[in-house]
Amino acid sequence: MTSKRFAIMEQPIVIQQVIDQVVHPHAGAINTFIGTVRELTKGKRTLYLQYEAYPSMAEKKLAQIGQEIQERWPEARVAITHRIGRLEITDVAVVIAVSTPHRADSYEASRYAIERIKEIVPIWKKEHWEDGEMWVGDQLETTSYPEGAPKMEEEE
């Protein structure tokens, strides 16, 4: 497991190690969001997911989300790790840990983080079902790539 607070990795995520990165004496709450691979999506039985990303770009966007959270909730500490590669049903795909002095901010910041991940982080998934497969171009599932994963763009 990496010690980076914002990481993309191929190996299974060790949840406690993500949490440990936000432990702080001023924290009265640590909220942890754990996103897993579910079996049914839109009525189709999922066999597994294949996540791909441009790790350096994705980690920059995760860090950007961390900065946005810091601006909105100045006392928050955030760590986010997203897994790539083949993930089976029930595997952990993403872990978000947020610590704040009070629980309400922790919940809000955690929700903000997952929504922003789905909006701006360049991670794609290929859904494999019993009757086919499809690349999903963004995690909001508004863009698909029937010809395969998107080509790498220039880094910002």
Curated annotation (Swiss-Prot):
UniProtKB keywords: Molybdenum cofactor biosynthesis, Transferase
GO molecular function annotation: molybdopterin synthase activity
Q: Which CDD domains match?
A: MoaE
- Tell me which EC number(s) this protein carries: 2.8.1.12
- Alphabetized InterPro entries for the sequence: MoaE_sf, Mopterin_biosynth_MoaE
The pathway where this protein functions is:
Cofactor biosynthesis; molybdopterin biosynthesis
Keyword Transferase set for record: yes
Reaction equations catalysed: 2 [molybdopterin-synthase sulfur-carrier protein]-C-terminal-Gly-aminoethanethioate + cyclic pyranopterin phosphate + H2O = molybdopterin + 2 [molybdopterin-synthase sulfur-carrier protein]-C-terminal Gly-Gly + 2 H(+)
Q: Name one GO biological process term.
A: Mo-molybdopterin cofactor biosynthetic process
Enzyme class, first EC level, given as a word: transferase
Which annotated residues bind substrate? 36-38, 46, 102-103, 118, 125-127
Q: Which Pfam families match?
A: MoaE (PF02391)
- Family assignment from sequence similarity: Belongs to the MoaE family.
The record ties this protein, via PANTHER family, to: MOLYBDOPTERIN SYNTHASE RELATED
Q: What does this protein do?
A: Converts molybdopterin precursor Z into molybdopterin. This requires the incorporation of two sulfur atoms into precursor Z to generate a dithiolene group. The sulfur is provided by MoaD.
Q: How does it assemble?
A: Heterotetramer of 2 MoaD subunits and 2 MoaE subunits. Also stable as homodimer. The enzyme changes between these two forms during catalysis.
State the protein's name: Molybdopterin synthase catalytic subunit
